[in-house]
């Protein structure tokens, strides 16, 4: 069963109107072009191409090669993936520009609306892109967030009460200006089906419900893994890398009109230990490598005294 959507975010008057054209991308064009890789089947695809966006501390290979990309390859499902700057430990506003380009590129080569899938911070940068570059909304059919930090996390508020942290962590506080701006005006937009998945065992994105998005049930589904499989033990990392229920819900969203429908997912998925694409014989080492890489990159992230300043285009008066 889908959970009730959270209330819409607050202040809107200081932020850009939701339909004001977005700014020109500031990232060099060559860097943007190099950041997106697609399968041959993504070109002129008859199916909804999946664009995968990695989370904090990792690139698409570390995040998805051993799970999602392998599963989509096995199913012969068209997909693209975007590499974000600095392994996503810097300013999320910069990452969002890469996502804007990736959406436009994937839409252009596929010649039809696409799906965006992101885990943790990888579910946030696409929403920032959709909010401040409104042309991208007509290019996206589905958004799937895997424990996306949609309203910030109290863990970050506790860890960085006075700043002095990595840019992304300060921006993903529940009290951040970044989160307020991203959720201003509207959290979700007509024409896009939103599926936001969460787990009650999330150790990083808290409190429970902070992943939820507001909007009509016809196009917004907020779903806890435990509402389908009560014994599902996946945590924040598991929901984005190996959980079979999350994969089943995401693929349901991509292959049917509207957001994921929990009623359409067989409860037999609860008996699956790992999602398709994950090799049981290498799962432990693959997971360990993912955690090691992410932890190392986060540890090396530059510490800032305060949240990065919001860009001028974010505001009504710029």
Model regions and ranges:
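Active-site-proximal beta-strand/loop segments in catalytic clefts of secreted hydrolases
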Residues: 53-56, 77, 82-87, 118-121, ...
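Active-site catalytic motif of lipid deacylating hydrolases and related acyltransferases
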Residues: 11-29, 34-113, 281-312
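C-terminal catalytic-base region of ester-bond hydrolases, centering on the histidine
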Residues: 190-318
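Surface-exposed patches in mature extracellular/periplasmic domains of secreted proteins
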Residues: 83-86, 112-116, 259-268
């Amino acid at each position: 069963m889908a959970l009730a959507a959270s209330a819409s975010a607050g202040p809107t008057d200081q932020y850009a109107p939701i339909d004001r054209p977005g700014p020109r991308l500031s990232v060099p064009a060559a860097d943007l072009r190099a950041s997106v890789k697609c399968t041959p089947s993504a070109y002129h695809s008859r199916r909804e191409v999946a664009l995968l966006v990695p989370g904090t501390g990792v690139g698409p290979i570390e995040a998805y090669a051993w799970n999602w990309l392998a599963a989509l390859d096995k199913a012969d499902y068209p997909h693209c993936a975007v590499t974000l700057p600095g392994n996503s430990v810097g300013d999320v506003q910069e990452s969002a520009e890469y996502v804007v380009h990736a959406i436009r590129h994937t839409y252009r080569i596929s010649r039809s609306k696409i799906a965006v899938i992101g885990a943790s911070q990888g579910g946030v940068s696409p929403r920032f892109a959709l909010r401040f570059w409104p042309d991208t909304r007509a290019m996206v059919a589905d958004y799937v967030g895997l424990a996306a930090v949609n309203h910030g996390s109290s863990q970050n508020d506790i860890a960085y009460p006075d700043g002095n942290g990595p840019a992304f962590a300060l921006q993903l506080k529940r009290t951040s200006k970044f989160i307020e701006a991203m959720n201003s005006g509207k959290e979700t937009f007509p024409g896009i089906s939103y599926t936001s998945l969460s787990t009650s065992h999330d150790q990083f994105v808290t409190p429970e419900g902070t992943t939820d998005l507001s909007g009509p049930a016809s196009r917004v589904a907020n779903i806890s893994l435990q509402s389908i499989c009560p014994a599902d033990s996946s945590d924040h990392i598991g929901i984005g890398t190996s959980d079979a229920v999350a994969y089943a819900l995401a693929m349901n969203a991509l292959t049917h009109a509207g957001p994921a429908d929990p009623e359409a997912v067989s409860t037999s998925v609860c008996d699956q230990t790992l999602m398709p694409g994950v090799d049981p014989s290498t799962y432990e080492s693959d997971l360990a490598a993912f955690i090691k890489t992410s932890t190392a990159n986060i540890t090396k992230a530059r510490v800032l005294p305060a949240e990065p300043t919001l860009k001028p285009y974010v505001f009504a008066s710029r």
